[in-house]
């Protein structure tokens, strides 16, 4: 069948019906039931994974009368399967139905109204955006009630806009600018701007996948929501959520094929990914896992700002960045779970997951009011009837974290085996039921404890620097000599509070390898060590800000730190030799700088 353009409001006739409503075209089919989710996993399993979003559309325009500047172009599949109703409020509702095969249409121009997809459960429906602006003050601008998969694709070189101008929507209503009751794929090589004045930006009841396109979403509540999963595979995505989360999932059960639901996955399997999130609440709120990974030889860059970090953006609509209940519209300075000076009880974390957070690559920058990374263990998962693990794992990538609370908080275990973790500001830097650093580079700046655990802290590899206003490294474990275990890492600690210690345990710590240089004011400094004096050297002294304090063994400098503050009556400890000497110099040019002001031989 030759493709042709089907123009809405063209010469197919207007039929008057009761109440001043007009029908154009063909009637809708009966509603179909929602499709069943079949996808959510870290591994790509899309049936169209190799599809080229720069594909040549088969539609060719023929002579037609395009009234009011809006057109529908048939491309492939079921032809002539839409109806258009002019409502008494002046808006059109265009419904695609009666689909008997996978179907593709393109739309262009300006529509004051909404589009409804009712394709049944057997066939994919693809709506191509070819330079379109859709605005509705009464309905969801784009709504897919049924399809096997709903594809929303921005054509290459086009700019497309969807505006939901509705006010508050009833709890029983659909409050999103783009909504799908089935799996939805938002893609293309053009651009798409979505604005919602009342609630969510883009919402899929099942799985939501985004790739390739330039996407901007501005909304009141959640910018991207997939009840079962959200998977970003490539593209340049910017999200603004004035009262909600940037990305959110809800489900924790498994699909009929046994795939775990509730994951948020950000990778680069389809090209470079640049994701920027500005959210009043959580940047990412995953009901199960949150994962960031570099795949396919491409890069991932994620920037998240929450609450105080996101104050510069206002909605391009009647909505504003208003204050949360009990707070003014000006976002104030931060507070946190550990810090009792918090001014709000809402969750304003950077990345939050109710099971685990896994980062295996990418460049991640988070400026959060609450914890930057937070994994819970107090939410029961439907799939297992067990509580989440609460684990956070970093094996590669570069993380830069700023928080008014914990930079990294795991109800379970924190594990860093590679990559670079830089905590620029925090109340407590890293906190977990256990903390393990076996590789990589970890730098922590905190106003209270640098690394804190209710259980064990094991530093077995990599490089660790802690600059803390409280305890440098603090374990509350009650196991003898198991609170802190130094077994291979190079560790430098500077603690500035006289009432705290650079190394603090309840029942002692163990040294079996690596090198440790620790400096703090005199006070709580004599922690029990299960290794004798052959591995420990210490002395008292004063230390001047800007000077390089070093530990030397047999005439070779081992570790050094450029003092960030002056300590008039202090204590310096070196683990690694019982005969180390200490000194101070203006510079240590012969050593390698692994962090700013931290040096190793």
Question: Which ranges hold each PLM region?
Answer:
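A composition-driven surface/loop motif
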Residues: 2-601
């Amino acid at each position: 069948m030759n493709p042709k353009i089907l123009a809405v409001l063209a010469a197919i006739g207007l039929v008057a019906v009761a109440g001043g409503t007009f029908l154009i075209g063909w009637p809708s089919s009966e509603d179909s039931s929602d499709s069943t989710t079949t996808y959510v996993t870290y591994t790509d399993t899309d049936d169209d994974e190799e599809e080229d979003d720069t594909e040549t559309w088969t539609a060719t325009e023929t002579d037609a009368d395009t009234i009011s500047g809006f057109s529908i172009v048939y491309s492939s599949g079921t032809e002539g399967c839409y109806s258009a109703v002019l409502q008494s409020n002046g808006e059109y509702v265009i419904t695609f139905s009666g689909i008997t095969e996978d179907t593709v249409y393109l739309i262009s121009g300006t529509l004051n109204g909404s589009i409804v997809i009712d394709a049944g459960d057997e066939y994919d429906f693809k709506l191509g955006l070819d330079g379109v602006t859709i605005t509705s003050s009464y309905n969801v601008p784009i709504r897919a009630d049924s399809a096997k998969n709903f594809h929303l694709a921005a054509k290459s070189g086009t700019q497309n806009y969807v505006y939901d101008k509705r006010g508050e929507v009833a709890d029983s209503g659909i409050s999103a600018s783009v909504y799908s009751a089935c799996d939805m794929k938002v893609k293309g090589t053009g651009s798409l701007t979505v604005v919602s004045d009342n609630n969510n930006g883009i919402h899929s009841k099942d799985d939501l996948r985004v790739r390739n396109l330039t996407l901007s979403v501005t909304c009141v509540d959640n910018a991207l929501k997939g009840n079962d999963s959200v998977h970003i595979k490539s593209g340049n995505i910017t999200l603004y959520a004035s009262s909600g989360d940037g990305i959110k999932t809800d489900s924790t059960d498994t699909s009929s094929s046994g795939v775990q639901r509730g994951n948020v996955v950000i990778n680069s399997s389809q090209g470079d990914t640049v994701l920027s999130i500005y959210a009043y609440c959580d940047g990412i709120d995953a009901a199960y896992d949150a994962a960031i990974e570099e795949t396919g030889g491409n890069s991932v860059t994620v920037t998240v700002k929450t609450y105080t970090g996101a104050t510069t953006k206002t909605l391009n609509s009647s909505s504003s960045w208003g204050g949360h209940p009990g707070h003014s519209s000006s976002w104030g300075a931060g507070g946190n779970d550990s810090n009792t000076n918090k001014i709000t009880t809402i969750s304003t974390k950077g990345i939050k997951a109710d099971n685990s957070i896994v980062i295996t690559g990418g460049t991640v920058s988070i400026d959060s009011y609450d914890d930057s990374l937070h994994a819970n263990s107090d939410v029961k998962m439907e799939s297992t009837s067990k509580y989440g693990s609460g684990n956070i794992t970093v094996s590669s990538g570069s993380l830069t974290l700023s928080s008014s609370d914990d930079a990294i908080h795991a109800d379970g275990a924190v594990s860093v085996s590679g990559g670079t973790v830089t905590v620029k500001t925090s109340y407590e830097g890293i906190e977990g039921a256990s903390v393990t650093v076996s590789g990589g580079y970890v730098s922590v700046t905190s106003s209270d404890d640098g690394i804190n655990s209710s259980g064990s802290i094991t530093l077995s590899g990599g490089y660790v620097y802690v600059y803390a206003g409280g305890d440098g490294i603090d374990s509350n474990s009650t196991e003898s000599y198991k609170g802190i275990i130094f077994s291979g890492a190079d560790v430098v600690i500077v603690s500035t509070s006289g009432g705290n210690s650079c190394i603090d345990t309840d029942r002692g710590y163990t040294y079996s390898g690596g090198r440790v240089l620790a400096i703090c004011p005199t006070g709580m400094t004599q922690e029990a060590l299960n290794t004798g004096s052959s591995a420990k050297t210490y002395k008292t002294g004063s230390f001047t800000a800007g000077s390089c304090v070093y530990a030397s063994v047999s005439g070779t400098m081992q570790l050094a730190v450029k003092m960030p503050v002056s300590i008039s009556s202090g204590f310096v400890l070196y683990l690694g030799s019982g005969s180390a000497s200490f000194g101070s110099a203006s510079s240590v040019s012969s050593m390698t700088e692994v962090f700013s002001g931290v040096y190793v031989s």
